[in-house]
Amino acid sequence: MGTMASPLFILIACLLSMRVGGAFFAGPLYPEMSNGTFHHYFVPDGYYEENDDPEKCQMLFKMMDNRKCTLDEDQDSVIRDDFTIIKRHIEDAARVLEGIGKSISFDLDGEDSYGKYLRRETTQISEAFSNSEKSLLELEVKFKQSQENELKEEHKISDDFLNMIVHTRDVLKETLDISLGLKDKHELLSLIIRSHGTRLSRLKNDYMKV
């Protein structure tokens, strides 16, 4: 009974191994496929514009057909195909990285790293703030000087007005004094004239009597 079981066990094991071998997939794993091709878009120069030609921005990866796993399949051919696909993927990835590198270099504006770029931008921003603060201080000083000049002008106008009032008052006083002096002289002249008239009248009368 044991001798009969051994050949049966070997036969069952062979059948199972053949079924397992027939279900095994030795081909490469691919990304999501659409119509048998994998579409990957990139911008050759790294700068996307609306007028870029879509044909130049599209790469088509040829996908291999699913191959049945057979015991007598040429493994060297499979490996060569896998290496060809990997090589294409690497070349396409290199082009994508080149475009990304150009985009990054454009963003960095000639700097070697983002650190240097950020330090330069920070320095420029600090200088801009410093210049703005300096301009504000200068404007504040000019505003204060303008206020001081306005106060000086106001004080000068007030002083000139007061001086004019004082001068006018002095002129009026002097005019009044002169007027009073003239009045006194007029009265004196009137007295002298009346005195002379009296003397002339007396002399006339005396002369007529003679």
UniProtKB/Swiss-Prot annotation:
Residues 1-23 form the signal peptide. It comes from the Eukaryota. One of its GO terms (cellular component) is extracellular region. InterPro entries: Fibin. This is Fin bud initiation factor. GO terms for biological process: embryonic pectoral fin morphogenesis. Residues 133-157 form a coiled coil. Keywords: Coiled coil, Developmental protein, Disulfide bond, Endoplasmic reticulum, Glycoprotein, Golgi apparatus, Secreted, Signal. The keyword Repressor does not apply. Homodimer; disulfide-linked. Seems to also exist as monomers.
